UniProtKB/Swiss-Prot annotation:
Subunit structure: F-type ATPases have 2 components, CF(1) - the catalytic core - and CF(0) - the membrane proton channel. CF(1) has five subunits: alpha(3), beta(3), gamma(1), delta(1), epsilon(1). CF(0) has three main subunits: a, b and c.
Gene Ontology molecular function terms on file: lipid binding; proton transmembrane transporter activity
Stated name of the protein: ATP synthase subunit 9, mitochondrial
Topology within the bilayer: Multi-pass membrane protein
Organism, scientific name: Trichophyton rubrum (Athlete's foot fungus)
Biological process according to GO: proton motive force-driven ATP synthesis
Record keyword Transmembrane helix present: yes
Principal localisation: mitochondrion
Gene: ATP9
Subcellular location field: Mitochondrion membrane
UniProt record similarity statement: Belongs to the ATPase C chain family.
GO cellular component, one term: proton-transporting ATP synthase complex
Keyword tRNA processing among record annotations: no
Transmembrane segments: 16-36, 50-70
Taxonomy, superkingdom: Eukaryota
């Protein structure tokens, strides 16, 4: 019974990865639109996009870490 609860909790914790995937898509979609509108700002926009990617990926990694903690530690 406890093992089933761990597996269900792990599955629910991994839903945070959905938000990270959507966030990364939004960041790079905005980068493409921004470069298409003003190509001279490509370097600046790319650095902002990498920063946004890192923050989005960090939230996804936190969700994955919580899932592993629920599965193997709790």
């Amino acid at each position: 019974m406890i093992q089933a609860a761990k597996i269900i909790g792990t599955g629910l914790a991994t839903t945070g990865l959905i938000g990270a995937g959507v966030g990364i898509g939004v960041v790079f979609g905005a980068l493409i639109l921004g470069v298409a509108r003003n190509p001279s700002l490509r370097g600046l926009l790319f650095s902002y996009a990498i920063l946004g990617f890192a923050f989005s990926e960090a939230t996804g990694l936190f969700a994955l870490m919580m899932a592993f903690l629920l599965l193997y530690v709790a």
